[in-house]
Curated annotation (Swiss-Prot):
<keyword id="KW-0808">Transferase</keyword>
<dbReference type="GO" id="GO:0006592">
    <property type="term" value="P:ornithine biosynthetic process"/>
</dbReference>
<dbReference type="InterPro" id="IPR002813">
    <property type="entry name" value="Arg_biosynth_ArgJ"/>
</dbReference>
<protein>
    <recommendedName>
        <fullName>Arginine biosynthesis bifunctional protein ArgJ</fullName>
        <ecNumber>2.3.1.35</ecNumber>
        <ecNumber>2.3.1.1</ecNumber>
    </recommendedName>
</protein>
<dbReference type="InterPro" id="IPR016117">
    <property type="entry name" value="ArgJ-like_dom_sf"/>
</dbReference>
<keyword id="KW-0963">Cytoplasm</keyword>
<comment type="pathway">
    <text>Amino-acid biosynthesis; L-arginine biosynthesis; N(2)-acetyl-L-ornithine from L-glutamate: step 1/4.</text>
</comment>
<feature type="binding site">
    <location>
        <position position="265"/>
    </location>
    <ligand>
        <name>substrate</name>
    </ligand>
</feature>
<comment type="subunit">
    <text>Heterotetramer of two alpha and two beta chains.</text>
</comment>
<dbReference type="InterPro" id="IPR042195">
    <property type="entry name" value="ArgJ_beta_C"/>
</dbReference>
<comment type="pathway">
    <text>Amino-acid biosynthesis; L-arginine biosynthesis; L-ornithine and N-acetyl-L-glutamate from L-glutamate and N(2)-acetyl-L-ornithine (cyclic): step 1/1.</text>
</comment>
<feature type="site" description="Involved in the stabilization of negative charge on the oxyanion by the formation of the oxyanion hole">
    <location>
        <position position="109"/>
    </location>
</feature>
<keyword id="KW-0028">Amino-acid biosynthesis</keyword>
<dbReference type="GO" id="GO:0004358">
    <property type="term" value="F:glutamate N-acetyltransferase activity"/>
</dbReference>
<feature type="binding site">
    <location>
        <position position="145"/>
    </location>
    <ligand>
        <name>substrate</name>
    </ligand>
</feature>
<dbReference type="Pfam" id="PF01960">
    <property type="entry name" value="ArgJ"/>
</dbReference>
<feature type="binding site">
    <location>
        <position position="182"/>
    </location>
    <ligand>
        <name>substrate</name>
    </ligand>
</feature>
Length: 393
């Protein structure tokens, strides 16, 4: 386990936002102003904290704190929700001695539920007093909703002979189909980076990781990824070292993205859909997403069924351009389909053991060009239905 990046403190408390008594309010404070980046949901119904966080970052890409509550999403809550969100930043800022404009909010929970402001007023001073008593692992645990486990990824790298640390924390198990679903993540770094470079690195890393996962095809109103870089290591990243930092950032987000799919509500499989030979990358993405979203493919994977017909049918309705006879479908290294028909391999026997594992790879070659795309998707189980049927109760 790596140490946390320098210059960040963590706090979690139980504010009573959830039915069960457990930490449900989490705070990160940087000892010094940090360069801040953000990537947000593309859902047209954007939660109040998304709107407010965008405003704060647009005004000035600097932050001292991130505060996240679990229990109420504060989405579709009208003017009252916006006012409440800004009030929470005032409360946290006052308790911590930080300008409210330098506090970034995020919320997760039931859509349409107003924040419990009386509980916020009582909890904010306790939260500030607890700073330094918790770890980034505690933070990840406090922001969970239907998650089965906290999601943390750490990375160290050497720049200019000095160790730079990154840590990422995320939550999400359902409503995951980001296009930066609910998916929240915070990444901390103790290097100094210019706002322009940090945001650019963030956008690229999110596009290559979080935007390439799906659990159920639903995109949340609250999707948020924050990144804070405070320079506490004494290292300024610039020039050629930016690519090195970008690779480390992408690695952290990629591991978090895998955990999000691994922890998809009720999931037993992580399906890696790899499409190649498309006319272009956009068509490869269309194929990967159609296969990854297919309920028939997902349930086949859950049932350990080498049902190539469901995969081929999904490929065929993706809208991509190709000749049917050029398509090759391979599952866990076993070729199932070629020349417009199934192969003569005994793939049910060959795949009996591989399909018992958690990781499943679906390779689809279209033979139409050089476009390629890769997507992570979960399977679909009885537990997913049970979890979401009972979510509000």
């Amino acid at each position: 386990m790596s140490a946390s990046p320098k210059g960040f403190r963590f706090a979690t408390v139980s504010a009573g936002f959830r039915k069960e008594a457990r930490p449900d309010l989490a705070l990160i404070v940087s000892d010094t102003p940090a360069t801040a980046a953000g990537v947000f949901t593309t859902n047209r119904f954007q939660a109040a904290p998304v709107v407010v966080a965008r405003e704060n970052l647009s005004a000035r890409p600097v932050a001292r704190a991130v505060v996240i509550n679990s229990g109420q999403a504060n989405a579709c809550t009208g003017d009252e929700g916006m006012t409440n969100c800004r009030t929470t930043l005032d409360l946290v800022g006052k308790a911590c001695g930080i300008p409210a404009a330098e506090v970034l909010p995020a919320s997760t929970g039931v859509i349409g539920a107003q924040l419990h402001m009386d509980k916020w007023r009582e909890a904010a001073p306790r939260l500030a007093a607890a700073l330094g008593q918790n770890t980034h692992h505690d933070f990840a645990r406090a922001i969970m909703t239907t998650d089965a486990f906290p999601k943390v990824a750490e990375r160290e790298l050497a720049i200019a002979g000095t160790t730079v640390r990154l840590v990422g924390m995320a939550k999400g198990a359902g409503m995951i189909c980001p296009n930066m679903a609910t998916m929240l993540s915070v990444v901390l770094c103790d290097a100094a980076v210019t706002p322009e470079a940090w945001q650019r690195l963030f956008l690229d890393a999110v596009d290559r990781t979080f935007n390439r996962v799906t659990v159920d095809g639903d995109t949340s109103t609250n999707d948020t990824v924050f990144g804070l870089a405070n320079g506490a290591s004494g290292v300024t990243v610039e020039g050629e070292d930016l690519a090195k930092l970008g690779e480390a950032l992408t690695d952290v987000l990629a591991r978090l993205a895998y955990m999000l799919v691994q922890d998809g509500e009720g999931a037993t499989k992580v399906m890696r859909v790899k499409v190649s030979g498309a006319v272009d990358d956009a068509e490869a993405e269309a194929v990967a997403r159609t296969v990854g979203h297919s309920q028939l493919v997902k349930t086949a994977m859950y049932g350990r069924d080498a049902n190539w017909g469901r995969i081929v049918a999904a490929v065929g309705r993706s809208g991509a351009s190709f000749k049917a006879e050029d398509v090759v479908v391979t599952l866990c290294g076993v070729e199932l389909f070629r020349n417009g028909q199934p192969t003569d391999l005994d793939f049910d026997t060959l795949l009996r053991e591989p399909l018992k594992g958690r990781d499943v790879t679906v390779d689809i070659e279209l033979g139409a060009g050089t476009g390629h795309y890769e997507l992570l998707a979960s399977d679909l189980t009885h537990d997913y239905v049970n979890c979401n049927a009972d979510y509000r109760s």
